[in-house]
Amino acid sequence: MEKLEKLYEGKAKQLYATDDPEVLWVEYKNTATAGDGEKKEDFTGKGRLNNLITTIIFDLLKKRGIDSHLIKRVDDTGQLVRKVNMFPLEIVLRNVAAGHFCSRLGVEEGLPLKEPVLEYFLKNDDLHDPFVNDDDLVALGVCTREDLAEIAPLARKINEALIEIFAKIDVKLVDFKIEMGRATDGTLLLADEITPDSCRLWDQKDHSGKVEHLDKDLFRRGLGSIIPAYEEIEERLAELAKSEGIEVAE
């Protein structure tokens, strides 16, 4: 498969055409950003780790009946993915109060939520990805009621699967954001990535109750390098994947 012209560049990834019109090449970058891109730094090895982590998680989800756009990992920082028509939407699932949820509702970080909270944010850099509800999305033509009737249960299914996956490696899944799109045949697919960039992950190995971040909050809050945490997540996920018979790149 040949990588052709660049189609798009975001904060964490680049997207390229290939010689197959139904296949795209995703290239993971070493850049970490926070605060709508105001804070920015390169971390050597981050792109490789996020490529590995997303590949492993998508493979684990596939074993649990959840399909994604991933075809395969092709090198350290590259993936081949199915071309999908993306919804311009960040889909957020929250299991524990943290981040924007706390500042918006005045609750303490770490509060366990009585049930998972599903939220939508419109992807719009100029508006800082505003929080929107179902009616907003339908009124703006972002998606239909029928789309939402598929998106919401799939998002909740992904949440349940990820809670189980991360619990097996002694990590609490606090919250995460995902994206979805439709393949050319109309199938709704999980797309984009699932990495410590897009999740809040708290280490539970010592069972002390103390919060130890294994995610991009280390960068957001100036708590140190993200690389050791990302390496730890990749190593634990790789061991889990191998135990489930999934081939993992060394």
Curated annotation (Swiss-Prot):
Its EC number is 6.3.2.6. One of its GO terms (molecular function) is ATP binding. This is Phosphoribosylaminoimidazole-succinocarboxamide synthase. It comes from Bifidobacterium longum (strain NCC 2705). Belongs to the SAICAR synthetase family. NCBIfam families: purC (TIGR00081). Pathway: Purine metabolism; IMP biosynthesis via de novo pathway; 5-amino-1-(5-phospho-D-ribosyl)imidazole-4-carboxamide from 5-amino-1-(5-phospho-D-ribosyl)imidazole-4-carboxylate: step 1/2. One of its GO terms (biological process) is cobalamin biosynthetic process. Gene3D superfamilies: ATP-grasp fold, B domain (3.30.470.20), Phosphorylase Kinase, domain 1 (3.30.200.20). It comes from the Bacteria. Keywords: ATP-binding, Ligase, Nucleotide-binding, Purine biosynthesis. The gene is purC. It catalyses: 5-amino-1-(5-phospho-D-ribosyl)imidazole-4-carboxylate + L-aspartate + ATP = (2S)-2-[5-amino-1-(5-phospho-beta-D-ribosyl)imidazole-4-carboxamido]succinate + ADP + phosphate + 2 H(+). Pfam families: SAICAR_synt.
